[in-house]
UniProtKB/Swiss-Prot annotation:
Name by which UniProt lists this protein: 4-hydroxy-tetrahydrodipicolinate synthase
Pathway: Amino-acid biosynthesis; L-lysine biosynthesis via DAP pathway; (S)-tetrahydrodipicolinate from L-aspartate: step 3/4
SUPFAM superfamilies named among the record's database cross-references: Aldolase
Self-association and partners: Homotetramer; dimer of dimers.
GO molecular function: 4-hydroxy-tetrahydrodipicolinate synthase activity
Enzyme Commission no: 4.3.3.7
UniProt KW Amino-acid biosynthesis keyword: yes
Key words of the record: Amino-acid biosynthesis, Cytoplasm, Diaminopimelate biosynthesis, Lyase, Lysine biosynthesis, Schiff base
UniProt source species: Nitrosospira multiformis (strain ATCC 25196 / NCIMB 11849 / C 71)
Amino acid sequence: MDNVAIKGSLVAIVTPMHENGELDLERFQSLIDFHVTEGTDGIVVVGTTGESPTVDFEEHHLLIKTAVEQAAGRVPVIAGTGANSTREAIDLSIYAKNAGADASLSVVPYYNKPTQEGLYQHFRAVAEAVDIPQILYNVPGRTVADIANDTVLRLAQIPNIVGIKDATGDIGRGFDLLCRAPEDFAIYSGDDASALALLLLGGHGVISVTANVAPKLMHEMCIAAFAGDLAAARAANRKLLRLHLDLFIEANPIPVKWAVAQMGLIGEGLRLPLTPLSNRYHQTLREAMSEAGIDLAISV
């Protein structure tokens, strides 16, 4: 694991927006400072949780640039650069490299349902076009296409394809990769509820929704798992369990943006087709936050 450069709790950071849906860059900068202070080990910007499908190309560039500048080398910045167009994924990855991002996160192409060979050729083309460490991102619940472990292992032979975010929640699948992939190929959980199990099997970190709300506790859980301190890791995860589950009570990032807004860190702005968290879930999420020891800045 020492050969993996980026490890630990990597927040899949939300994108703050004003009520009219415009980007709130001031809050975005403050949010990055908050994560640095709270011990987050890396910032993943403009991913699923960052509402990448509804930001335009210029905004996508601006968010990457702002994240890199605000982080200022204090923590690694991983730029979401995935697209279902290989050309677009290449363009975004080139921008991320030139902006100074430490790595890119490239989602499995969605909607057009490529074959396994198509997935291999897509990611290889991106890797050959731009020399930035590339992390694959498999989330078949959203993309429909599902990259098989054998395809991942083929891609792991390409020097600048350095890891995968596996959001399937399938621990057996993750362990299979840990057993067969090169030692310097990072396996990140993309499923908060099962992340601890993968970490204890040798996983390298978690790209986390929960870390938006409980960054310090997520960091502590990872550190304990890496140290083999099962009791401490389980104790941290026990406090986080309801958050892991209830942050998906409606489609991500609806609940997490509401929760971060209750902490006073951002406003509640979303872009259609996402809509605000249903009122009936507010108390459920407040209770989950309370179990994790999170203070609410906004009173009921």
